[in-house]
Amino acid sequence: MSDYVIIGAGGHAGVILDLLIARRENVLFLTDADPARHGSQLRGVSVTGSDDRLTGLDPTTVNIALGIGASGTDLPARLTTRRAIADDLRNRGYRLPSLIHPAATVSDGAVLDDGAQVMAGAIVQTGARIGHDVVVNTRAAVDHDCDIGDGAQIAPGATLGGNVQVGCDVWIGLGASVIQGVSIGNGAVIAAGAVVIDDIPAGARVAGVPAKDIH
């Protein structure tokens, strides 16, 4: 059992809290930038204030779990901001271990970088690399030899075939499918339900079956 503090107290933080409880970790408290959440609780764990509550904690004994998700407009910018928060915490000496829900399936031949989060029901196959601060969400599937760039998020139910290359800060939406061997550039957004059969350039926004640019 390890001690954790969760940064954020919204919906994604609740999922991370469930993950840590399932792993029988000890969650000390949550922080949040929104004062309206201070003094509230999630599953009996207190939201005690903003990130300044970390002051005085020993970063060699307390781990950090990033409970900040991404939603709404300008998703790549939100993902970049999320990754910057994680990098700032690391620069201050805190550890953000990779987290795997006990109900996820992750091959021993896969590599998870610090801060990666794999949720319940997700599958990560052999040879895959999951970058720093990536979220592989509920029931998402990442097949063999994929490479997922730092900060990317793979939404619930999305499926990636083998050898897919995903850049940094990419959003792959709910239930999207990406066929084998495709490359997706940094900051691209794949809409929910899209079927990607061709390479996607950096910064593109695509939707549909097959996926087409919607700029």
In which residue ranges do the predicted regions lie?
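Cofactor-binding loop segments of dinucleotide-utilizing enzymes, especially the Rossmann-like FAD-
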Residues: 9, 32-33, 69, 101, ...
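Active-site phosphate/pyrophosphate- and oxyanion-stabilizing loops and adjacent acidic/basic residues
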Residues: 18, 87, 194
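Phosphate-bearing ligand-interacting subdomains
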Residues: 38-101
